[in-house]
Amino acid sequence: YPDRSAEKLATQPNMATSSSMIGTNVAYETGYTGAGTRIAVIDTGIDTDHQSFDNGAFDYALQQEANGNENYIKSLDLLDQSKVTAVLSQLNIAQNGVSADDLYYGSKLPFAYNYVDKNTDVTHDNDTQSEHGSHVAGIAAANKYVPQTDGDETTYVSALDTVKTQGVAPEAQLLVMKVFGSNGGAFDSDYMAAIEDAIVLGADSINLSLGSSYPGPSKYTAYMDADTDPVPVYQAILD
């Protein structure tokens, strides 16, 4: 047989061009960066320590946009502990005895909850459900800047220039709703509860990259109820 061996080349992931391919450069030039919006990602959770979701870098980006305008950030109506506290009793998770402080991971991730395990561990560390949630969250809203530390000093540098990755809406906040965990998933009762909570929390869009062999009519009812709020609901259907 002929020698069919091939050299394995090193892969260099590069998402730097993906946003411009869908026209986001035009949106950015007109001021649409996602600032003041909330994206709910119902998935496997998130890497809370990842540089793309750094709270300091998120705050820095908003300060750059403000450009000295003291009212700019206030006008964004960012989700914070006080706003979560105000609606906590309306959330499905209220019965589990959590507080807004428990759910708050910072300005970039102001709400994060594990619906399947009924706790606030939304990382990928304690189950085998993959890091898919971080991937999805990054595509949607990975920060415009990433932290760079030199000794005791932290500065923020362009994410596109340094790590070749930036989300479509880099200045949006993320609502992390983990529906895959150590107890399995995703169960209808969990992601439907997450959809309802996302609406209460003021999500501007809801993403579910989920799939099943036969989706029952009840989930479509939940989606339609969400869409009439109106909140766009996006689901990736996988075979």
Question: What residue ranges belong to the model's regions?
Answer:
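Autoinhibitory propeptides
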Residues: 1-31, 35-38, 49-61
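Active-site core segment of subtilase-fold serine proteases
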Residues: 44-139, 143-159, 167-168
